[in-house]
Every structure is written in C-alpha cells, then in structure tokens.
Amino acid sequence: MEVTCLLLLALIPFHCRGQGVYAPAQAQIVHAGQACVVKEDNISERVYTIREGDTLMLQCLVTGHPRPQVRWTKTAGSASDKFQETSVFNETLRIERIARTQGGRYYCKAENGVGVPAIKSIRVDVQYLDEPMLTVHQTVSDVRGNFYQEKTVFLRCTVNSNPPARFIWKRGSDTLSHSQDNGVDIYEPLYTQGETKVLKLKNLRPQDYASYTCQVSVRNVCGIPDKAITFRLTNTTAPPALKLSVNETLVVNPGENVTVQCLLTGGDPLPQLQWSHGPGPLPLGALAQGGTLSIPSVQARDSGYYNCTATNNVGNPAKKTVNLLVRSMKNATFQITPDVIKESENIQLGQDLKLSCHVDAVPQEKVTYQWFKNGKPARMSKRLLVTRNDPELPAVTSSLELIDLHFSDYGTYLCMASFPGAPVPDLSVEVNISSETVPPTISVPKGRAVVTVREGSPAELQCEVRGKPRPPVLWSRVDKEAALLPSGLPLEETPDGKLRLERVSRDMSGTYRCQTARYNGFNVRPREAQVQLNVQFPPEVEPSSQDVRQALGRPVLLRCSLLRGSPQRIASAVWRFKGQLLPPPPVVPAAAEAPDHAELRLDAVTRDSSGSYECSVSNDVGSAACLFQVSAKAYSPEFYFDTPNPTRSHKLSKNYSYVLQWTQREPDAVDPVLNYRLSIRQLNQHNAVVKAIPVRRVEKGQLLEYILTDLRVPHSYEVRLTPYTTFGAGDMASRIIHYTEPINSPNLSDNTCHFEDEKICGYTQDLTDNFDWTRQNALTQNPKRSPNTGPPTDISGTPEGYYMFIETSRPRELGDRARLVSPLYNASAKFYCVSFFYHMYGKHIGSLNLLVRSRNKGALDTHAWSLSGNKGNVWQQAHVPISPSGPFQIIFEGVRGPGYLGDIAIDDVTLKKGECPRKQTDPNKVVVMPGSGAPCQSSPQLWGPMAIFLLALQR
C-alpha cells in the first residue's frame, strides 16, 4: 500500500510543460495611494496628479521570465529647478510628503536579460497653491493744466500655483468685475513672474477707499482650499521712506562698538524693517532690533555692505545701504622693476630702477606710504621720485623711482604704510639694493624631478630658488586643465619652495609647475620648473568574486586579470584553496614578459576539488584577490510568477491549492537535476512540510509545475525549492505565496468564494439599495457589536476566516435593504446550482433573498429563494436551482427586521453547472491542515485509468 501511495504521489501532482517560457520583460505603471486626479484623456501622455504634501505611490507591474528587475528613474518637470535623477530598485515607488520640485516624468525600466528592457513612463503633476501676495502702486498725474491731479491706484495680486489659479477681486464683500464701471479695470500684465492679476482704480473716488480682497482658487483641485489676502486702502496709504543716522560709508577702527539706526520717515501701513548683510549673513554677535543695528567690538572681517529694507506692500521697498569699513592692513609686498624701457631684467648702473610697495588695506585709498633709505627718510630729487597709483601696478601702490642708478644709490630701502591718526599698527617692508641683487633662477634638486610615493602617504615636491632677494614659489597643476591643488586653490604660495601634500591619492598623480612670484622680488618674467608626482597604488583585479559551476569530471580554467594599478604589472601571484597554499602553476612563456593575469587550471571538478579558490595578486605596492567558488552545485530554480489563476479554492473546506511553476536556471551547466526538495511553511509558524519531487531530464526553458494542496485560507506560505544532482543539494530559491480569492465563474466546476480577499470575488455593492454588506471576521468585528445576533466566526470556525454580513443597528430602519451583486456570467448550460451557507440568528431577523438578474433583454430581477426569521446560532447550507435564459448575475438581498438584533451573514458561495444535490451538506465539515492528510491524496480530476490500474495490480 505504501509503495502505491508513493508512486501516486510522484505521478499525480507533478507536471512538465513545454519549453521556451523565457519571455522578455513587460511593464505597466499603476498608481495607488493619495492620488487626487488622474488625467488619461491622451493615451500617449499619462498624467498622475497629486497634491503637494501627499504620498506618491506608483507600482510597476511586470511580467516576463525570469522575474524582471525594476528600476525607477526620474527627469525634471516644469516645476523643478534643474535636471534631477534618482534610482529606486523596487517595484513600488513611494515618496512621502511629495514636493513640487519632485514633479516630472517617472520611468519604470524592467529587464530580465531576455530581449530588450521594457520602459514605461508617467508624468507626475504636483498640485499646490501658495499664499497670495498683494502690492499697491500709486501714480499721480496733472490734468488740464494743473487745475487738479488724478490719482490712480494699482493693486497687484501674485500667486504661485499649479494648476493656474483663478482670481476674484472683492471690495468689501462685493465682487468686482472687469469694466464694472469707469473707475475699475482688471487685467493681466505681460512678462510677469508667476500668475498676476492687477486691479486698477482710475481717478480715485471716495468710494474707492475701502478694503480690497484678492481671492485665489484652483477650483478645489485635489481638495486645495481657496486662499485670500486683504488690503485696506485709505487716503493716507503711502510707500515707505527711510533715512540713516550715519553716512552711507562708515569707517571705524577695529574693536569699536558700531550702532546704525534706520529711521522711518513715511509709510502707511506701518512698514516692516529688516537688516541684511552682503556677502553672507549678519556677523555673530550682531543684534538687529527694529531699525537699530548693533555690532559690538567690530573686526576687519565684519566689513561689508549692510542693508536696511522697509516694506509695507505699497510701492517699491525702501532701501538704504551702509558700507562699513573697518580699518585694517595686511600683506605688505614689494617689487623690484629694472629699466622697463631697455627691457632689462638686471640691475645695472646707469639704468633706471623702480621699487614698489603695496599693502592690502581697508579703506585702500586712506593708506599713506613713507620711504626710508638706510634708516633715514628718503629725500626727493631729480633722480629720486616717489609716485603713487602706477597704472601697471595694483591700486594705491607707492613707487620709488631711481633715475640713472649710481653706486651711491645702493643701500637698504624701507617702505612704511600707515593709517594717520588711527590705532592700526604700521606695516613695513625692506628692500636691499646692491651689486649682489640679482633676478631669481629656479630649478629642481637632483633626484627630485620625479617623486614616487604610495597612496595614502605624505609627499613633498621641492623647487630651489636662487637669487637675491628670493621670491616666493607658486605651485599649480600642469597636465589637468582647471585642476585644483589639494588645498582647493588653483595656485598655492610656498615661501621655501616646498609643496607639502598629506595623504596623497591616485588622482593627484601628474605634473606640477613651480614658478617664481613677481612680488617680494624682481618684477620680471617668472622662472619655471616642473616636478612629476607618481602615486603608486595597489592593483585592482577582476573578477573580485566569481561563482564557477561545472559538471563533475569537467575541466575548469580560473583567470585573475589585472585591471589597473601602479605599477601596472603583476609582480607575484599566489593561489590558495580553502586557505591552503597551492604550488605555483606553470608559467606560459608569452605571458611571462608582461603578465597581466594569472591562471589556474583544474583538470576535473570533483567533490574534493570543489570549494573556495583565492588568487592573491601583488604589484610590490599592495595586493588584491580574486575569489572563485568552484562547485558542481545546480543553480537555483526560477519561479514563474505569471501563472494564470494559480489559486484554487475548495467549497467543502476552508482550504485552497496553489499551482507552483518554475524553470531551472542553466540546467546544462552542471549535472542533470534528479529531484527537487520542496519545503512549505505557513508564515508566523516554525514547522515546515518537506516533500521530494522526482524529475526526468530538465531542459532550459522547460516549465515545471507542482500543485500545493491543503493550504489554509487565508494564510500565506513560504515556499523553498532546492534542486538535487549527483553532486548534492544546489542553490535554494524561496518565495511567498498569498491567497487571492478567485473570481466566481460558472465555467469552473469547483469554485467557491470564501470572501477571504478584499476583492470579494468580483462581487459589488448595489448602488440603489439602502446600505451595504460588510466583510469581516472574528478579529476585525466591532467589539461593541450587538450580542445575541450574528455569527461568532465564519463557516470554518477559525477567527481569521471572513464572511459577509449586514449590520442592522442604527441608523438602519425596518425594511432597509442591502444588495450584494455577483459578476456577470455567460449562460452556457440550462441549469445551475447556487450553494451557500447562511447564518440568521436573532429575534429581529428579517429576510434573506436570492435574486437572479437576467441580462438578455434589459435588467430583470427574479426571486429564486427567500428565508425569514430566526434560524439559530448555527451555519446552515442552502442549494438553490436556477435556470437563466441568458447572461445573468446573482444577488444576495438582506432585509432589515423590526429591531437591531437581526444581523444576517453568508459565506462560501458556489455557482456550478447542473442540478442541485438532493441532500443538504453537513455544515460541520472537517478542515484538513497542510500535510496532515494521507500522503496519497490528490485532486479528483487526476484519478484516471492509471490509478485504477495500480489499485488492481495491488490486489
């Protein structure tokens, strides 16, 4: 008997279908969540409209085998500031509190390696309405030779919105319209930012002095309410006017306390005052209170422009600016310029010579310079001139010119810069002029032209400068256009000619230029030299990790290739197997000269040679490893997600079956698959049922199938599937299967609606009745529900099971009806049987009616069955024969009785062809848990001649 059952188990539930189920990806975008409007009038332009701040939820529904991978991308929309792109690798795209800048076109790209990827898009339009802004402008013009003045007022209302807003102007509570009278004009100006409407009041009249309201509306799109702003126009309405308590340019000494007052001289309504600083925010410690700005202990960094702005939405804002200058001096420099006319670069007797001195000061024009020679003030003469503001030099530079240089002019010259009468320290710089004063030369020390360091180490680039005086050295990059130094600057000054770099990286490799500065030395053509920096870094190899599959007995070649490194060569390669060192493989002569890869050949894959191989490659700077996992394991199965109607329910129990389908990934890469190990576990439970599924030779693209039976409604299950070959277990694949209620169809001989799914098998609420049927179970029912009426659980007796019922408590009244309408069925037989369970318990039970709605000539409802009154606190079954004459629907009608104790429930509705059974089915049926039944049970339709033959053979 056991042998027969095992043989039946192997033959009956397992099927193999044809090959070629691999299919390219197909995609469709559906929307969910808090969408407010969806415009699909134009098929080529799908628009999903959502309110700003709501949650955007888009789903990319995909088909294809293997299961496609989904990627979401976005390009900017009209409300976005610039191009944006974001990638989300998930079938569901969810954005909480979406902003207007997140509007745009969203693309769903699905690909599975078969054919070309599927790309679908939808445009997301974010709806919003900002607070409106209202400004007032006035003009006064003379009319008829100054006899009187005509005053015109423009009220400008501006708002940002999507979609475009509608404007409504009101005077008090009265709505104004265009050309309502000669004194009112409403128009939209050209070339304006945002949406604007202007209310023009011509030749202002007494009645025009009133409160004006600008109301903006997007016509309640997405539930966005209207917004409004009000302004009261009076005969004193005026734009703001300001004056400052200080001059527009304020020069102070460092350390002083600065106070600036911005005084209002006009404006109605009362203007608002605000201080700002440019560039950057107000200094730390600065206090802006009303129109008073206080800066304690001001420093040089606090210099800048301080703006006082007054606004009252009348006219243009009034603005006053104070240029605060904090006295300071820094960076004293000098220049030695030989005779320019003779284009000389050396100091020579008999030629002209110019010494220049400059400091960076605030204010620059207030700096005074004084020259000294050998400690004494320089005396002006025909050969010694002091000039200021040389056009060839920086602004406010003092120059000492020596005409026809004599030997007596040699000496030490000192330039002193100062602020007269200010507590700012003087700055000075010395210049020594002698026969030893020569222009600079620059060179790279021997052996320092090429600097080679390892990545992450410090580096020092050096250039030597000779000459007197020695100018600073300026460093820059040569080989990379517009490249910055590690300091973030394009040019860096070093006083000793050494550029020090910390923790160099590979992108710092290249040529660096060192050149003499034209200040603090000779003002001549810069001298240059170059230093090459080579940054060595460890090798990068591929593959970093690779899964190598091969059948037992077949050879395998493992290759580790060098991608990049410095130096770009393999100095050594070491192979390890499971951490143990392997002898070096033989070297190919052609690859020994410049090796860029390392190879290891396995003559045959065996159980002993299967495992982890590591190739460690070194270039004398560092090392990198290629990892290979060699085995004869079978690849994981590929679940087929496009099975039509995989769920099948059973009318006599709260169980369902599921059609599980899959293909085997690369079955020819390893040994043939002998069988599959199937493990199925109900979610939130630990015990699993394990079954073995034997198979014949599996080919690529061949669709395999197994029917999972005795699954409990409405639970979900985790399914794990593992292929087995002669090598052993392969890679496991897992998925979650969910119960989905199948839609009733009379074409299926055994199809029961348990109402476990929210779709309730396609049933709908009638729109013409008084109230609705409710779907619930023992876990979701209202704890305050009336006692002594309604079922405690569904027909299965489990708290998770759902049923449909009518709640007859208030505000329901006697005779109120609730109708539940089935999908439309095409009549293909003369007789049908409607079977269902009902629960009618309570002293106020009304009636439960079954109607048939015929659709062959309009909609005609016919009573097929009716039951009234209290039938006890039990589930009972009814079989109702019907004979529709054409397409039809069935309707369950619940009628409310005289009181609130009249809840009626139905469950497990079945529609099948043929006549109804003569005997009623016992409602107390037994529910079989998954795996608890006899191992040789199977679906009834699979019992055929083979089963009869096996039973006969057993006897």
Swiss-Prot record:
Residues 779-798 are annotated as: Disordered. GO terms for cellular component: axon; cell surface; dendrite; extracellular region; extracellular space; GABA-ergic synapse; Golgi apparatus; plasma membrane. Residues 24-123, 132-230, 240-323, 338-432, 440-532, 539-631 form the Ig-like domain. Has been found in brain, heart, skeletal muscle and kidney. Found to be overexpressed in tumor tissues. This is MAM domain-containing glycosylphosphatidylinositol anchor protein 1. It is a lipid-anchor; GPI-anchor. Keywords: Cell membrane, Developmental protein, Differentiation, Disulfide bond, Glycoprotein, GPI-anchor, Immunoglobulin domain, Lipoprotein, Membrane, Neurogenesis, Repeat, Signal. Residues 1-18 form the signal peptide. A lipid is attached at residue 932 (GPI-anchor amidated serine). The gene is MDGA1. It is found in: Cell membrane. It comes from Homo sapiens (Human). InterPro entries: Cell_Adh-Cytoskel_Orgn, ConA-like_dom_sf, FN3_dom, FN3_sf, Ig-like_dom, Ig-like_dom_sf, Ig-like_fold, Ig_I-set.
